Amino acid sequence: PKAKRVIHLCMAGGPSHLETLDHKPELARLNGKPMPESFTKGQQLAQLQGSRNKLKCLGPQHEFKPYGECGRLMSSAFPHIGSIADDIAVINSMSTEQINHDPAHTFMNTGSVIPGRPSMGSWLLYGLGADTDELPGFVVMTSSGGGQDQPIAARQWHSGFLPSRFQGVKFNSKGDPVHYVNNPAGVSRDNQGDLLNTINGLNNLLGQRQNDPEIATRIAQYEMAFKMQASVPDLVDVSKEPKHVFDLYGAKPGDGSFASNCLVARRLAERGVRFIQLYHRGWDHHGNVKGAINTVAGHIDKATAALVKDLKERGLLEDTLIIWGGEFGRTPMAQGSGRDHHIQAFSVWMAGAGIKGGASWGATDELGYAVAKDHVSVHDLHATMLKQLGINHERLTYRFQGLDFRLTGVEKARIVEEVLA
């Protein structure tokens, strides 16, 4: 396996591929003109877009420039991500099945639109186990800013029908990362340890009688909570980080920003956390896409590039897989001054852990409406991720209610070998 861990940078709300990674000069030429019917005929359109005969093209709202030795054309709104163009592989031919945020996130995270399935991080913990016993193996953090802050349901990091010890743990971005990390006044760590040993002894007796795996999970969770009272304060104490690191990320300790979360993500990676998921809410740009992209770029551009550069400098990028992207794309048609949800095409990029830096794969049509070449499904993305972790996606299964479930579903998923070194 090339990867030991995954950092998933989820740009929640549906980033526009047309203002980030997918260069469309023909769309710019048709700006303000009617959307050619040849693209939309027979297509189911989002309800928010209005009648079909009023659809107008909206040209890219930001200039694209070549970045890196690979010369990849990328939005000039994200110059810092442009500076790592030679480290990332871009896939411009993604599509999804769900046009609303929550089910689209559910599909991206679990490979199914049916709530209650295990999330990516839970599957990884089930398949590989944790690489640390001092912190949870699956950690989630959220930030917001730049647009409408769509809520992120906790089931996006749930373990579903897998044992609950595999579910993600959400860290707070401000204040104590987890509740009750400090003991109440008058309760020493020794007192807490004695209480924990007594409770676990009783749970062990109950487990021997009932043979319930959730009792074993409860014991493990109590033990993890006790360890986290020591490990979490050390994790979030960034006071020993040098000033140049804060400058690199653009982070201010404790401000709850995406930049601060990226710095914590690096520290989680150093400590062996298997799956780290950062959500940044603010990409739902139904209006003012030009200004909103500028705003959200101010939140995520510098920190995203800093995370890649920092991991690379520390020798961690070679075994850390980074995935950047959202739940769907945006329409090439205007919705006022913005763009509507779009499932036929969107872009993601990957870096680290055996990814071919500077590579590009797939293409959309000349307006960015639909995939035209080398389609990549969400399940293909999952299969590729698992491959880099040394997992055969067809063999990572769990029997539930008489069926063998897997992250990549029952249809054939393809590993995107073209973005692998």
Language-model features and meaning:
Residues 1-421:
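Ligand-binding pockets and gating/stacking loops
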